[in-house]
Amino acid sequence: MDHNAFSEITPDIVRLAKMSEQADIINSELFTKYDVKRGLRDLNGKGVLAGLTHISDVRATETVNGISVPAHGELFYRGYNVKDLVEGFTSGNRFGFEEVTYLLLFDKLPDEKELTDFRALLSKYRSLPTSFVRDIIMKAPSSDMMNTLARSVLTLYSYDDRADDVSLPNVLRQCLQLISLFPLLSIYGYQAYCHYHDGKSLFIHQSLPELSTAENILHLLRPDSSYTPLEAKLLDIALVLHMEHGGGNNSSFTTHVVTSSLTDTYSVIAAAIGSLKGPRHGGANIKVVQMFEDMKKEVKNWEDEDEVANYLKRLLHKDAFDHAGLIYGVGHAIYSKSDPRAVIFKSYVEKLSEEKGLQKEFALYSLVERLAPQIISNERQMYKGVSINVDFYSGFVYHMLDLPMQLYTPIFAMARISGWAAHRMEELANNGKIIRPAYKPIGEDKVYINISDRK
């Protein structure tokens, strides 16, 4: 079977798909009748309580006179405000990814020796099995780097003599190896695709033990391995801001769900990758960049507030860009007044825009940040406030770093693997039951019909 035949949607498939859709549609009123929390969230977007965690805390409300009201968002890793963590390692002129990974896994900020030893351990694990690049990554490269990453993770199972051992020491070893290997798996997969599909020169850099994770990403990706200190610093901050966001986000909850079945680490992380790949989860920053590229073509004067506002209204009316009715990068399931990750990001983003000569683009982003919340509030029925989220600026950062769009979501995964690892360890340590929520059957009982009597 050739590739085109494999991918073909025949008239029979279209017909059967319509039958399937008709059989599966559920009257939306029934969800209200049976008080189903669709998406495991209530009408205000608050998640149903499904578990407990030490790892992080997402705060977006405060209590005033006994009433919960929206507040500026805060994010805590193991009890530490992320804002303080970022200020701490940047003021100390350190890279933070390894330090904060240590915190997430062990509930402790490392001292200098502990941090040095941990970095050395991650560096030791930053090496793929012999011939893995040639035999696995270079064969049948996918156009989607998240699929490539998931395939590589699942294949590593075959190289692990203790792949199915779910004891905590073994799982920690596997998680640390995957944290170290994600940049290599993602970037090598991208290089292979560019070579075989786009005809570009193939270059494979080896990781360098003296470099941080952020520095290694830029070193591995760029042909000349060069980068500025500000570029590496901002990518490191991006990794820290994306590495964890509670146990209820889709990929971390997937990690808990699949871990609860006591399957192996590679299967768990591959499932989390599949979750993060979805455009409702990890792919949003790509949409932000694409939306702004369309905006820059459609809006003649980027400084004209009325013209920019009109474009944003057209987005909401499904009359611009992808006609989805969304302003990408604005709004969040939990945060309403502000996303702390976006707030932290913005000052560093402005510095990089100055270094790259992209001040006009930054000014346009800032203008949309100011206009969009009010326009959404005027145009839509809102149950809570709305503000920009971390995706709003992260795509712009990756664009300024000349990172290919195909790697935007894998870079999210390079960060979030630390959070997934912490959640997997937490689920195993507490030895909970397999996660199995209820689904209410609403179909009618039927009497069996012999095949000769069916119509």
Regions found by a protein language model. Name each.
Residues 1-455:
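Non-transmembrane, aqueous-exposed alpha-helical and coiled segments at domain scale
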